[in-house]
């Protein structure tokens, strides 16, 4: 899925060029609106928007990146709320992606997209709260 209809057409063309003849459902939708296609946990693989695809990210003339922060906060909330038990793989040139999502990656694999350094981050989504409680001081 992608918010851009052009990306859907491009993806379908690339699947055909790759010889993938079976139908893969593609739809135009905002990332925050996705829902699991089944009750059985699976895998999500995505290349989330960054740079010019998300608006202002990486523009040194802009101090804060509210658009990107809002997008990744909403995406993270969607993944946490709807995809417990799923493995989520995000491919990005933004090496600070786990921090933006406020998620701890289970694994990160380095790749290059041409000269652009990227990572494939794996997140194992869990139900509920995954932070450990801080140690409480012993009473005297």
Regions found by a protein language model. Give the residues of each.
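Class I S-adenosyl-L-methionine-dependent methyltransferase catalytic core
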Residues: 1-140
């Amino acid at each position: 899925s992608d918010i851009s209809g052009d990306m859907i057409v491009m993806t379908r063309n690339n699947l055909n060029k790759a010889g993938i003849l079976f139908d893969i459902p593609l739809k135009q939708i905002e990332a925050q609106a996705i829902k699991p296609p089944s009750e059985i946990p699976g895998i999500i693989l995505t290349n989330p928007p960054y740079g010019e695809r998300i608006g202002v990210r990486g523009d040194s003339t802009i101090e804060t990146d509210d658009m990107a922060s809002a997008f990744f906060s909403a995406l993270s909330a969607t993944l946490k709320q709807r995809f417990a038990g799923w493995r989520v793989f995000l491919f990005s040139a933004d090496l600070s992606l786990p921090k933006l999502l406020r998620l701890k990656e289970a694994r990160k694999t380095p790749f290059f997209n041409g000269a652009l350094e990227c990572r494939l981050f794996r997140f194992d989504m869990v139900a509920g709260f995954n932070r450990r409680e801080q140690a409480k001081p012993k009473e005297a």
